[in-house]
Amino acid sequence: MSFGFFFVYRSFAREALIPSDSAMGSVLPADLFLGENNMQLYIAGGCGDQGRNCFYIEGDRHAFIVDAGTSTDGLDRLPDLSPEMIRRAEYLFVTHSHKDHTGAIEYLENNGFTGPVLMSNQTYQQIHYKPKNTMILDSTAPELSLDGELSLRWGRTGHCAGAVWYYITVDGKRLFFSGDYRENDTFYRCDAVRGLTADLAVIDSAYSRMDRAEDMRKAVADAAKDALSASAPLLLPVPSYGRGLSMAMLFYQTFGEAYPIHMSAKLRDQWLRIGHRSYFAHEEILGYPFDIFRSWDETSLEGGHIYFLTDAQLSKAKSRQLIDCHPELSVLMTGSLHGYGKAKSYYESGRAAFVLWPNHLTKQETADLAAANAFSLVVPFHNPKEKPETDVYTF
C-alpha cells in the first residue's frame, strides 16, 4: 500500500471516481451522477484547508452533514455549503467540540438546517453555542437507528473527552468518519477501529510525517526535560479540552514528582471531573491522587516547575504579559499555530520553542488504520498542506 502526497486509496477494484465539474456552491442534480444506490461526498472544508472541517453526504433518499467547523486562519471562514444543501440535510453528526468542527453550527441553523445535531454529552457541555435540536449519544448504547435506512455505531477517538468516530449505514452504503483520532493516547481511551468494512472512509491525516505517536511523544518529553534542566519554569499553552491532560500524564509518568505540574483552573477542573472515570481515562490512571496536578493562578512561577496554560494560541493579553514579564520562562508550543492568536509570532521570533504533540494521526498512522480495515475509498482530511483531487466523490 502506498499513499501519495494527497491520496484517495481504494483497497480493491471499483468503478472510477466521478469528479464534479460544478462549484461547491450548488447542488448537483441527483440523476446527473447518481445511479441506483450511489451517493456523493461533498468536501465543504477540512481537506487542504485550515480547519473548517465539514462533509456533506447525499443520495437519492438521505442527506446529512458530518461536522460544521470554521477556519483556524483567523478569518472564521464558513463551510462551502449551498442553501439547498443546508436545508436538505436531515442530520448533523458532530465528532467533538473544537471550533474547527463546531464553529458553524449556529450558521447552519440560521440558514435553514432544522434537523437533530448528534453529539456526545461531553461535547455538548464543552461547546458555547447550544444547538436548538440536540440529540445526545448514549454512552451505554453505542448503536443507534435513526430510521429504517440510516443507522450508526460510534466510539471514542482518544482526541479529547467526548470526541467520537461514526460508522454510518445508509441506503445500503457504509461510511466511516474518524473525527480527530488518536489511539494509545497517554490519558484518553480510544475504541480502536479494526475490521470494519466501508464504502467510504474519511480519516484524520493531519501530519504529513511518516513516523508514529511514540516518537513524537518522546520528542516532547525530551524538549521539556531540556528546558527544565536549566531550573527554569516551563510554560505549555494548551486548549481547554484535549492534549493538556495527555501531556501532563506523560510528564508525571516520565518524571514523577521531580518537576511539579500546575494547571490553569479550567484544565484542572477537567482532571477533577474525568480523571477517575474509567469511561475516559486509562485504567492505570484511576488510582492516581488528584493532587499530582496542582491548581495554578496563571501568575506565580517557580523554577523547575511545569505550567499548563489554557490559552493555546496566546490570544489573551494576560498570557502574553506573563511571558513578556518573565524572560526566564521557557515556552513550549505543541500544537498547530493558528491565525487568531499570537502563538505563531512568539515562535517565529524565537521566544517560544515548538515540538508537535500527537493528538492526530500521521500519514503513516492513517495508512496503518486503513490497512486494519476494509475501506473501498479513503479520503484523508485535516491537513492544510494536502489538497484533494476534487471536492466531490461518488461512491
Which residues make up each language-model segment?
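Pre-active-site segment of Zn-dependent metallo-hydrolases
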Residues: 35, 47-94, 98-99, 103-115, ...
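Active-site neighborhood of phospho(di)ester-bond hydrolases with catalytic His/Asp-centered motifs
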Residues: 66-68, 89-100, 105, 117-120, ...
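C-terminal regulatory/interaction regions
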Residues: 291-395
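Hard-cation-handling environments
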Residues: 223-332, 381
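Catalytic core of the metallo-beta-lactamase
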Residues: 56-59, 143-200
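Glycine-rich phosphate-binding "P-loop"
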Residues: 203-218, 282, 347-360
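Short, Lys/Arg-enriched N-terminal segments with co-localized hydrophobic residues
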Residues: 19-38
